[in-house]
Amino acid sequence: QNYLGFDNYVVLLGIVLVLSSVLCVVLGKVVDKRGRVRSSFPAVILMAIGMILMFFARSFIVTTISGVIMMTGYLISTSVLSSLVRDYTPKGKEGEIQGVRMIFQVMIPMIVGPFLGSFVIKGSSLTYTELGVVKSVPTPRVFLLSFLLTLLSLIPLVFLHRRERRS
C-alpha cells in the first residue's frame, strides 16, 4: 500500500486470495494423482517463484499475478507438507509430533520472523505514521529474504524425495 502506492490494495488481495484458492482446488487433483512427496518440490518452487516475482513487481497487474503465483504455491505447499507430517507421524506419537511441528512451524517463525523483517525493513528511507507512531515502509526486500528462506525448505525435501525413491 505505502511502497507501491495502491490506494485500494483490498481489491488486489481479494483477487489474489480467490484466484489462488480456485487454483489450489484444481491443482489439488494433480497432487492427488502425482502424490504428495512428488508434488512438494514443485509447490515450494512455485511459492519461491512468486516471491521473487513480488520482489520485482511494481504495477497492480504484475503484483496481482505474482501474488497469485506466490499464494497458490504457499497454499499447496502448506497443504502437502502438513499432510506429509501426518503421514509420517508414528501411531501413538501424534501429540508429541504435533507439538514439535508447532515449535518449528509456529513458535520459531513468530520469534525469528519479526527480527528478520525488521532488519530488512529498517534499511528503508520511506516512513508512514500509524496511530501517531512513525514506522518504516516495508519494501520488496522482504520478499527477497522470504525467497531465500523458502529455498532452505528444499533441503529436507531432497532427503524426503530420496527416501521415497528408495522405498
Give short role names for the model-derived ranges.
Residues 23-35, 121:
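Helix-to-loop junctions at the C-terminal end of transmembrane segments
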Residues 121-148:
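A membrane-interface helix-boundary motif in multi-pass transporters
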